[in-house]
Amino acid sequence: MELKALFNLDPNVKVRTRFAPSPTGYLHVGGARTALYSWLYAKHNDGEFVLRIEDTDLERSTPEATAAILDAMEWLNLTWEHGPYFQTERFDRYNEVIDQMIEQGLAYRCYCSKERLEELRHQQEANKEKPRYDRHCLHDHEHSPYEPHVVRFKNPQEGSVVFEDAVRGRIEISNHELDDLIIRRSDGSPTYNFCVVVDDWDMGITHVVRGEDHINNTPRQINILKALGAPIPVYAHVSMINGDDGQKLSKRHGAVSVMQYRDEGYLPEALLNYLVRLGWGHGDQEIFTLEEMIKLFELEHVSKSASAFNTEKLLWLNQHYIRELPAEYVAQHLAWQYQEQGIDTSKGPALTEIVSMLGERCKTLKEMAASSRYFFEEFDGFDEAAAKKHLKAAAVEPLEKVKEKLTALSGWDAHSAHEAIEQTAAELEVGMGKVGMPLRVAVTGAGQSPSMDVTLAGIGRERVLARIQKAIDFIKAKNA
């Protein structure tokens, strides 16, 4: 029987990349960068992007992790043309190919016991040889196919595997370094390295972008592809991401999963912009729209060196995008933060107004939601330091006067509120701060907020007047 790829693919598509995470945990920033590079390369070349879930590790793979990966990809807006495909749904296909390989002499059954393999390894180590299988079962005719066995790929014993890595250049591995890889376990399940090969073949993958930790798998996979008569993709192995201390990025460096960044109030545009620059660049340019990334991205410009993750740089980018993206769009992401923090925004200013007021001040949307709570709900008490400094006996007169002015307003907007504050200061012959600061603490509970006119307009007349009275009562009670 002839070995051939399974899927009917569009022959006009010249580039087809894939992202193939294992659902054993959340999508971390290293995986997200790999997905982004793979996605950008496909888009840059008018190609297609395939999403594949490599869930052959049945013990560690979970539906929750799969859902989290899909959520993260959707949040980042890294859409896919094909998939998601699940390896566990393709076991029949893998076993079909393995059986054909046995039939054609490309693979063989191995009946060796664990004890024999352990003894072989000890002998080879004692002789200072590289541990590898000795092909004891290659021509075995004594055992029945129904006896317990694994299946091994018959790896070439001569020559070398040579491939041109799109990031690292020429890589050559002698076949003497490679073993006869197990491609099917004794329980009948195919192994990771084999499933990957069949998937890449069936799915017409032309370019494999993945982490440098996969380099050792590549020669083994290339040899299997050659045995199948399948085309060899271009491989591009990207470097690891380290923390700012030079150590491999981990939880101790802060958030490492993509959705943690969403939870912390980052915009997807900021994270994508940061990740694309973490190992790739275009001159001195720092800010890239997604359209610019697609236009400019080339694998040849990806760095071979490890990159250092810098949270301050990501924060800077996030504030840039909060400030520069349309307020309507930012407000959609901000709404999720309010929901997470249990803040009911049904009574208060439009969220686009919050973005306009606080966009220059806040580095994250989480900070923006937390610091604008007073627009939507009452606060229990005043910030202790702010109250001590500004809610003194001398503040009663300015607060009573400005309350009187605000009560008398026919309309309620930022301009009218500003005039009321200005008139109060003029009549009392004091600086604007003598009115504005006690007023700020009175209506927000804290010593910092956007300008008082827009803050008052956003909070609303009824709440503002009630809070001013509450502050006056607080001062009088404190000084009674």
Curated annotation (Swiss-Prot):
Coiled coil: none annotated. Keywords: Aminoacyl-tRNA synthetase, ATP-binding, Cytoplasm, Ligase, Metal-binding, Nucleotide-binding, Protein biosynthesis, Zinc. CDD domains: GluRS_core (cd00808). ATP binds at residue 251. Belongs to the class-I aminoacyl-tRNA synthetase family. Glutamate--tRNA ligase type 1 subfamily. Its main location: cytoplasm. Pfam families: Anticodon_2 (PF19269), tRNA-synt_1c (PF00749). A motif ('KMSKS' region) lies at residues 248-252. Its cofactor is Zn(2+). NCBIfam families: gltX_bact (TIGR00464). It comes from Mannheimia succiniciproducens (strain KCTC 0769BP / MBEL55E). GO terms for molecular function: ATP binding; glutamate-tRNA ligase activity; tRNA binding; zinc ion binding. It catalyses: tRNA(Glu) + L-glutamate + ATP = L-glutamyl-tRNA(Glu) + AMP + diphosphate. It is found in: Cytoplasm. Catalyzes the attachment of glutamate to tRNA(Glu) in a two-step reaction: glutamate is first activated by ATP to form Glu-AMP and then transferred to the acceptor end of tRNA(Glu). Monomer. The keyword Mitochondrion does not apply. A motif ('HIGH' region) lies at residues 21-31. Its EC number is 6.1.1.17. This is Glutamate--tRNA ligase. GO terms for biological process: glutamyl-tRNA aminoacylation.
